[in-house]
């Protein structure tokens, strides 16, 4: 399985003004924007970390997901939420011949934590032996910062501020996440039962 981001979050969607206010940086100076590239980097790092911990796409972007077989032919759970649209479904055989599956043969079952690609009939199309299925989908809470739930938006600002304030710290342990951030994102994390984990 290979999950790829096909589109990036545009700079205009990043909450740079809100982040500067959160950090209490001075304003009204000729060089107000001198740190913008650095601040954008911390915001992108915080977004990526929270998306990784929660399995959620925060700001809308397109993904492609390549897999060798369906987890269940009656419905394939998608690896990221919330999904707003399935853009395409393509089957490729071992010699890379493509078969585009018509949108009338599948549907999106929306779910806040575990959206599922479902067949319109009884089963999803058979993935060719030695081939793959590629699902292209759009996921995220919306196109702008204001579309995020308030607690996730606050978690991003807190984590980006943590990265900014500890930018020269090298002794932090791996996976370190401030308690306030961890508690804000906890309800968005996937629950894993019976050791199967997310697939």
Task: Please give the residue ranges for each predicted region.
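Divalent metal-cofactor coordination and adjacent catalytic microenvironments
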Residues: 1-199
